[in-house]
Structures are given as structure tokens and as C-alpha cells.
């Protein structure tokens, strides 16, 4: 069955369930369809209604799917390991029907995991996830912010700001869009201020501004590498050679 056929089959099961609420055969079929669509908790809720009780074998696929999704959510929240999130999502997706796309929530989680990894390839993968979601709905604020964050991590701050603003035009109350828009704008402003001090030979003020800019988003390796290079040039003009060397070393560690 195609994904749309699974949705149709689910609606048929719901209609049958309304007519005969305790029909175990209907409930088993409904639970299997929910699982095939990636709606594991709904499947488990249906299994709980079945009398006599559904067997462990019947429930195993939905339980494993829910366990892996919960693990992915927990790892996203409490760890910096994007690869562990991807592994959990891969395991969860094994329970989907072959013609069913992963749920939107899972795809956003995958994009978030790619952002956590922060490599050139993974940032491209995050962009691909966002673009796939935006092809389905160009006004998806979460997908717009996901793409904006990937662009920001790649140093494309102007494009990132455009995406955050577009997300806010879709949902003016979306806090993540506000958060990242303000952060990128603040960082750009401080970089420009530091560059202005450097241009006119105000090297101590430039060092101070660049130092403050490094505190705006410690996780953005690409941008912070550039700021460290700029601060290193200031230190060299001030003949603070060890500080200059230290910043160059740190910049290379962040962006080899």
C-alpha cells in the first residue's frame, strides 16, 4: 500500500471501530497501521484496548519504535551526540511501511542531529532535510529555522537571517526563530564593530569587542574561528605574540 492507502485504511478501521468498538480484529489492524505510519504511541494505546490482551509479539514493533523515538528525543535534549540520535531514528524507521515517509517530527529531529554533528557534510544533510520539508510546506516555521541554523553554521549569516524572519512571518510567536534571529544579528553587529576598531587602529577596543563576540554563541565553530583570526591580528599589531599564536591555534582547532 502507498502512504495514502495506509491513511485510507486507517480511516476505514476508525469507522469500523465506531460501529463495533470491541472488535479485536479491527483493533489489531488499526494498531498495525498506526505502527506502519510511525504513530507508535497511538498503536500502543489501541493495543491496550484489546481483549483478550494483545501478546508481547503483537506489540513488539510499536514498543521498539516508541523506545527508539524516546531515546532519540532524550539524547537530543541531554547530549551533544548527533550520531546516537541518528542511530535511534534509523532503528525506529525500520518499523515504518516501505512506502511511508518518516513523520515530520522525526525528520526535524534528524535535522537537529545533523546540526549537532557540525561537520561540512552533516550541515549539508541538515539543509537537505529542511529543503525536503519545505517542498511539502514552504511556510513551515520549524523547517525554515532548521535551514536558517544550517546556513548560520556555514557562515551564511545574511541568508540565515532571511530564513529566521520568514519563519516569524509564518508564526510571529515562534521563540526559536526570535532566539536565533537576535543571536545572529548581535553577532554580526559585534563583528562589524570589532572590524571598525581594527580598521582605524583601535586594537585594544577591537580585542575587547571580539572577545565579547566569542561569548555570543560558543557552539558556532566557523564564525568563532574567523573571530579568533581577527583577534589574533589585533594581538600581533599590539606585539602580544603569545596571545596571537594562541588564537591562531584555537581557530585551527575549530576550523582545520
Residue ranges and their predicted role:
Residues 1-256:
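Alpha-helical tetratricopeptide repeat
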Amino acid at each position: 500500500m502507498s502512504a495514502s492507502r495506509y491513511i485510507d485504511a486507517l480511516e476505514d478501521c476508525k469507522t469500523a471501530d465506531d460501529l463495533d468498538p470491541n472488535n479485536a480484529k479491527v483493533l489489531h489492524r488499526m494498531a498495525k497501521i498506526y505502527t506502519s505510519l510511525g504513530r507508535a504511541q497511538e498503536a500502543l494505546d489501541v493495543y491496550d484496548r484489546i481483549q483478550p490482551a494483545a501478546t508481547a509479539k503483537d506489540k513488539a514493533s510499536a514498543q521498539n519504535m516508541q523506545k527508539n523515538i524516546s531515546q532519540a528525543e532524550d539524547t537530543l535534549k541531554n547530549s551533544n551526540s548527533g550520531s546516537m540520535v541518528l542511530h535511534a531514528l534509523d532503528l525506529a524507521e525500520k518499523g515504518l511501511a516501505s512506502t511511508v515517509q518518516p513523520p515530520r517530527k522525526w525528520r526535524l529531529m534528524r535535522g537537529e542531529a545533523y546540526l549537532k554533528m557540525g561537520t561540512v557534510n552533516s550541515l549539508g544533510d541538515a539543509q537537505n532535510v529542511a529543503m525536503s520539508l519545505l517542498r511539502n510546506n514552504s511556510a513551515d516555521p520549524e523547517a525554515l529555522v532548521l535551514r536558517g541554523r544550517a546556513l548560520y553554521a556555514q557562515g551564511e549569516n545574511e541568508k540565515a537571517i532571511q530564513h529566521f524572519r520568514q519563519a516569524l512571518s509564518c508564526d510571529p510567536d515562534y521563540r526559536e526563530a526570535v532566539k536565533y534571529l537576535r543571536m545572529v544579528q548581535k553577532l554580526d553587529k559585534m563583528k562589524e564593530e570589532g572590524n571598525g576598531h581594527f580598521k582605524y587602529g583601535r586594537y585594544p577596543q577591537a580585542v575587547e569587542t571580539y572577545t565579547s563576540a566569542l561569548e555570543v554563541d560558543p557552539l558556532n565553530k566557523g564564525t568563532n574561528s574567523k573571530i579568533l583570526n581577527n583577534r589574533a591580528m589585533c594581538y600581533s599589531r599590539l606585539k602580544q605574540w603569545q596571545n596571537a599564536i594562541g588564537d591562531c591555534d584555537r581557530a585551527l582547532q575549530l576550523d582545520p
